[in-house]
Design a protein with these regions (language model features):
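Carbohydrate-binding surfaces of carbohydrate-active enzymes
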Residues: 2-292
């Protein structure tokens, strides 16, 4: 139930797309969108109608990300009880000449035209790691921010970057094999389960590109902190050691300034919020430095 029109449509589309990619990646198979609202819900803070064409776009997005179809909730509006004003294919009027009914019909007609896509898969050379255990442990760790770690926001920043380049993304967990991927992103992977660092090391040794972030490799799968430095098991792979992490107030920002003549030609200053990792170089080269 994405909240279309609450923010820029492209931002909602990125959020929705990542959810689809996660569902597809859980089993590596096509999925069904079980509940698609034809118009507006009745339980969100504002019951916003989908603008003309938005139901079609939402349905086709699911197909493009590996879906097999879109099922609706609900077919017919009830006359009473808690969901009597929830969107439906057939409203209280009961006719087939409504705007919503025609939009639903258009989706069905299009699915017939593209039925050869049924059973096909999405090929991705990039994977992002999302781990529920790590998220739960991180959010209950009592530091470095007890309110607002913004984990999903960090995930979406990585995801948007890939999608803006037209790159398909699988959203995987620590048990997945990595052989088919060229790039692996690890946003805020607080918990490294047993053997995970070794798997990542092997991925890099075999030519894979690793992208990670602050607050990664901090604790094991019992939420006990690793000793002898973090990110655990990857300090030599990344060429850094995390020495401290600074939790910023909501109103506070830091900024990063490119080093003159840096290898990537970076020339813009970027702001950062919430968390700032202080690192010690152990073989890595500096591209940017923090201003504060």
């Amino acid at each position: 139930y994405p909240t279309w029109h609450k923010e820029a449509v492209i931002d909602t589309a990125y959020d929705n797309g990542m959810c689809h990619d996660l569902m597809r990646s859980l089993k590596g198979k096509p999925f069904f969108q079980m509940e698609s609202c034809p118009t507006s819900t009745n339980w969100q803070s504002v019951s916003k109608l989908k603008k003309p064409g938005m139901l079609f776009a939402q349905s086709m997005q699911a197909i493009a990300h590996g879906g097999e179809g879109a099922l609706y909730f609900q077919i017919r509006q009830s006359r009473g009880a808690s969901e009597k004003f929830h969107g439906a294919v057939i409203d209280h009027y009961g006719g087939n000449d409504t705007r919503v009914f025609k939009e639903v019909s258009r989706v069905g007609e299009t699915l017939k035209e593209i039925r050869e896509l049924a059973g096909t898969t999405v090929n991705s050379s990039v994977a992002m790691l999302y781990d529920w255990d790590s998220q739960w442990a991180m959010e209950d760790s009592q530091g470095p921010r007890n309110k607002g770690l913004h984990y999903l926001e960090a995930m979406l920043k990585f995801y948007r970057g890939f999608r803006k380049q037209g790159v398909n993304v699988d959203v995987i967990d620590m048990t997945c094999e990595l052989d088919k991927y060229q790039v692996l992103a690890l946003p805020m992977v607080y918990m490294f389960k047993e053997g995970f660092a070794k798997k990542i090391r092997s991925f890099v040794e075999n030519g894979g590109t690793l992208i990670t972030s602050y607050w990664s490799g901090i604790a094991d799968d019992t939420d006990r902190c690793y000793l002898e430095g973090t990110p655990h098991g990857l300090m030599d792979v990344l060429g850094i050691r995390s020495t401290e992490i600074d939790g910023l107030y909501d109103w506070e920002e830091n900024s990063f300034v490119p080093v003159a003549g840096n290898e990537l030609g970076l020339d813009k200053t970027y702001t950062c919020k919430y968390l700032c990792d202080l690192v010690e170089l152990r073989g890595a080269r500096t591209l940017m430095t923090d201003r504060k």
